[in-house]
From Swiss-Prot:
SMART domains linked: RHOD (SM00450)
Molecular function GO labels: thiosulfate-cyanide sulfurtransferase activity
Catalytic residues as annotated in Swiss-Prot or TrEMBL: C67
Family per record: Belongs to the GlpE family.
Domain Rhodanese: 19-107
Phylogenetic placement of the source organism: Bacteria, Pseudomonadati, Pseudomonadota, Gammaproteobacteria, Vibrionales
Record keywords: Cytoplasm, Transferase
Designated name of the protein: Thiosulfate sulfurtransferase GlpE
EC number: 2.8.1.1
UniProt cross-references to Gene3D superfamilies, sorted A to Z: Rhodanese-like domain
Source domain of life: Bacteria
Keyword hit for Amino-acid biosynthesis: no
GO CC terms of this entry: cytoplasm
Catalytic activity from the UniProt record: thiosulfate + hydrogen cyanide = thiocyanate + sulfite + 2 H(+); thiosulfate + [thioredoxin]-dithiol = [thioredoxin]-disulfide + hydrogen sulfide + sulfite + 2 H(+)
Length: 110
């Protein structure tokens, strides 16, 4: 894959739920937004955690990139492709679409 692909919320959730799935969901929203609510099992990807991601995730594993509305994730997805990741997807609609579909999220209580 030389360029990232788009993926719907339903397709992404289905991919993540497959029994033998190695797919990783990364959330690139700011720390405050991520702290308030994020998808269950999402990895918070920032400039500071990029090296950690590259050390923990094989380049062959599918990576799904999520932002707020599906715009910023496209640039981040292409960046990951350029770093050597082979299967990268930008989540259409971002976190807002994930929340609208009532998919599992971790929410700060307070």
């Amino acid at each position: 894959m030389e360029q990232f692909e788009h993926i719907s919320v339903d397709q992404a959730y289905s991919l993540l739920q497959q029994e033998d799935s190695l797919a990783v969901l990364v959330d690139i929203r700011d720390p405050q937004s991520f702290g308030l609510a994020h998808p269950e099992n999402a990895y918070h990807l920032t400039n500071d955690t990029m090296v950690e991601l590259m050390n923990q995730v094989d380049f062959e594993q599918p990576v799904i990139v999520m932002c707020y509305h599906g715009i910023s994730s496209q640039g981040a997805a292409q960046y990951l492709i350029n770093q050597g990741f082979e299967a990268v997807y930008s989540l259409d609609g971002g976190f807002e679409a994930w929340r609208r579909q009532a998919l599992p999220i971790i929410q700060q209580i307070g």
